[in-house]
Amino acid sequence: MKITPIPINKIRNPSFAIFSTIKSIVSKESFDIVHAFNIPSAFAMKYCNAKKKVLSVHGMYSEQVSALHSDTTANIAQITESKVLKWADKLTTDSLMVKQQYKEKLGIDFDFIYAPLDIEKFKDLPNVPKKEKQIVYIGRNSYEKGIDLLKEIENEIDANVVYCTNLQWKEAMIKLKESNVLVVPSRMESIPQIIKEAFYLKIPIIATNVGGIPELITHEKTGMLIPPNNSKKLKETILKEL
């Protein structure tokens, strides 16, 4: 289902939920399986004509909303979340941490399935030379991603910091490939796909030890883990890696 949400911060997800739900209600198509990603998509999933419905989540949705929105919005999300999850025949997540959170807080069971990495796509990437002292951030320009922490210390680092917040996948991978370090300064996460992509391209990683990130990175073996919300430690670790 192709839906274009309103591209405005804090309106994007609600607009997607509304538009996709309307499309599902009026659609006459039927399916064997409908697979929805994250809570905003579940409303469309509910009204789809399908034999089985699968909902995958990447992080505990109510906690994500709580970090970004008002208490009222967070309370609504928490109440809605527990109801929405019951609409699916099967629930999946790509993080053991998220699976545990939902079990402990809502008593809901999820199947754990790692998100795959399509390595065939990497064959189309061109060979690019490394750029000296280049650091790259790839992700949304959003508070929970911690991009502000990197911007806070950018002028204190003798390096070129590249922010890829709205690039197509291939363009972002070229930037990653030519960089010396990938920085993932998130305040909350599930399992960032960008870490797997950096592994494949053999790019060193500095990431916060939040969410499912420690499920991928072993400190000082497969990457560097730092505490969240700590721009000082982020700067120290970047300087050490450079």
Segments predicted by a language model, with ranges:
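Short His-centered aromatic/hydrophobic patch
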Residues: 36-41
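Carbohydrate-associated surface elements
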Residues: 97, 116
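Short hydrophobic beta-strand element within catalytic cores of glycosyltransferases
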Residues: 204-207
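Conserved donor-binding/catalytic core segment of Leloir-type glycosyltransferases
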Residues: 92, 129-145, 151-154
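Active-site proximal beta-strand in glycosyltransferases
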Residues: 33-35, 48-65, 92
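Aromatic "clamp/platform" in nucleotide-sugar-dependent glycosyltransferases that forms part
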Residues: 187
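Conserved acidic donor-binding segment of nucleotide-sugar-dependent glycosyltransferases
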Residues: 219-220, 224-231, 239-242
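Membrane-proximal helix-turn-helix segments that form the acceptor-binding/catalytic region
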Residues: 73-91
